[in-house]
């Protein structure tokens, strides 16, 4: 007769031979890739940040129309001989901007504005290459985390669209016999607006990759809905103000009225509605465009205070600090905007004003992110 089966001993012995469970193994497997992708996105963020600044300087130096053709590939090489430089100069001499306002230019002067525009376009090519190499590398090595293929591809598509919109903008100013000396302001606003959208998505993805997927899932459960909703509204309102700022830059409206708080001694400028049909004034009248930018700024800072009052009620220190940073940056931006007007929008102040707009934009995104994914702290504050 066989001996009784030692059921519990056999089970215990079998269990002893199995490897111990390792919690978080799947997350650890992808953590290295998440960190690498985050570094790649941080590089892209820095490049786009610089691109926005260079684009602003290109506009402020009236360099944007110096290259009259769009050659995405062959245009990567600048003129390499005197004959090539002469050819580029002759193309520029044929457009209205030169004939109307820049006939004084010699070759040396033309080269200055040409290098600004060439550098702006070249930086765009560099951004495209950095995106393509990074995306291709992670794709081939199968290191893209689940759910991220579409997000990273979307950035590339936005970048391609930005290049096309850039030429669409420039083409509006490369005219002959039409009396046009600048690009269309609404196209400039579209171009700048998309740049902020691209930068915003990159910043958001960087913040997402800065924390593990389980951590984000856990944080989502303690989402602060009021702060999230109000910061979303502030983000959209700020974007509107950025577009209005682009309209101001597009028609040099910042130099049309240099007093504050009034405009030419009036609360509402007398030149605001002089164009026909009337809708043109909202895009082309320096008086009305600057007036809209000013009034929107006043309302925006008031709304920022309201959002901050709600944000400071958050139970999470990191979230409260994020809203404090938003209020501080927005206040500084309003003050800088007034200074820009009073000094007639000189290039160095105007570019600082635009750069600070980027910082405000990112800080609002961070406050919104922390409202949706709070960083929980213990009673001890750790």
Swiss-Prot record:
EC code(s) of this entry: 1.17.99.9
Residue ranges crossing the lipid bilayer per the database entry: 37-57, 126-146, 152-172, 188-208, 231-251, 288-308, 332-352, 356-376
Record-level GO BP terms: heme A biosynthetic process
Assigned keywords, A-Z: Cell membrane, Heme biosynthesis, Iron, Membrane, Metal-binding, Oxidoreductase, Transmembrane, Transmembrane helix
Amino-acid positions noted as binding heme in the UniProt annotation, renumbered to this chain: 293, 353
Catalytic activity of the protein: Fe(II)-heme o + 2 A + H2O = Fe(II)-heme a + 2 AH2
Any one GO molecular-function label of the UniProt entry: oxidoreductase activity, acting on NAD(P)H, heme protein as acceptor
Its membrane topology: Multi-pass membrane protein
Any one cellular-component term (Gene Ontology): plasma membrane
Keyword Transmembrane helix on entry: yes
Pathway given in the UniProt record: Porphyrin-containing compound metabolism; heme A biosynthesis; heme A from heme O: step 1/1
InterPro entries with a match to the protein in the record: COX15/CtaA_fam (IPR003780), HemA_synt_rhodobact (IPR054616), HemeA_Synthase_type2 (IPR023754)
Subunit structure: Interacts with CtaB.
Role summary: Catalyzes the conversion of heme O to heme A by two successive hydroxylations of the methyl group at C8. The first hydroxylation forms heme I, the second hydroxylation results in an unstable dihydroxymethyl group, which spontaneously dehydrates, resulting in the formyl group of heme A.
Annotated PANTHER family: CYTOCHROME C OXIDASE ASSEMBLY PROTEIN COX15 (PTHR23289), CYTOCHROME C OXIDASE ASSEMBLY PROTEIN COX15 HOMOLOG (PTHR23289:SF2)
Protein name: Heme A synthase
Organism: Roseobacter denitrificans (strain ATCC 33942 / OCh 114)
Protein encoded by which gene: ctaA
């Amino acid at each position: 007769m066989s001996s009784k089966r030692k059921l519990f001993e056999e089970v215990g012995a079998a269990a002893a031979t199995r490897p111990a469970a390792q919690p978080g193994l799947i997350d650890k497997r992808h953590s290295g890739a998440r960190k690498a992708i985050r570094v790649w996105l941080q590089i892209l963020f820095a490049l786009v940040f610089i691109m926005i600044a260079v684009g602003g300087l290109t506009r402020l130096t009236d360099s944007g129309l110096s290259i009259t053709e769009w050659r995405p590939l062959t245009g990567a090489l600048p003129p390499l001989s005197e004959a090539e430089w002469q050819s580029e100069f002759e193309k520029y001499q044929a457009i209205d901007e030169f004939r109307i306002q820049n006939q004084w230019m010699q070759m040396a002067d033309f080269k200055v504005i040409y290098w600004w525009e060439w550098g702006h376009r070249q930086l765009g090519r560099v951004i495209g290459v950095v995106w393509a190499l990074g995306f291709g590398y992670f794709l081939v090595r199968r290191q893209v985390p689940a759910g991220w293929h579409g997000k990273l591809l979307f950035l590339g598509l936005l970048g391609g669209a930005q290049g096309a919109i850039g030429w669409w903008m420039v083409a509006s100013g490369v005219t002959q016999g039409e009396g046009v000396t600048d690009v269309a302001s609404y196209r400039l606003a579209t171009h700048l607006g998309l740049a902020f959208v691209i930068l915003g998505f990159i910043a958001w993805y960087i913040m997402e990759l800065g924390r593990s997927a389980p951590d984000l899932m856990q944080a989502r459960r303690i989402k602060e809905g009021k702060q999230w909703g109000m910061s979303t509204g502030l983000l959209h309102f700020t974007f509107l103000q950025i577009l209005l700022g682009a309209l101001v830059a597009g028609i040099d409206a910042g130099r049309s009225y240099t007093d504050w708080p009034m405009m030419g001694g009036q609360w509402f400028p007398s030149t605001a509605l002089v164009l026909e049909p009337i809708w043109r004034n909202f895009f082309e009248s320096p008086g009305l465009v600057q007036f809209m930018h000013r009034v929107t700024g006043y309302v925006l800072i008031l709304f920022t205070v309201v959002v901050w009052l709600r944000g400071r009620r958050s139970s999470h220190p990191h979230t409260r600090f994020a809203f404090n940073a938003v209020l501080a940056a927005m206040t500084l931006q309003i003050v800088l905007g007034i200074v820009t007007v009073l000094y007639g929008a000189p290039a160095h102040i105007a570019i600082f004003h635009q750069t600070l707009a980027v910082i405000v934009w990112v800080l609002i995104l961070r406050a919104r992110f922390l409202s949706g994914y709070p960083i929980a702290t213990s009673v001890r504050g750790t």
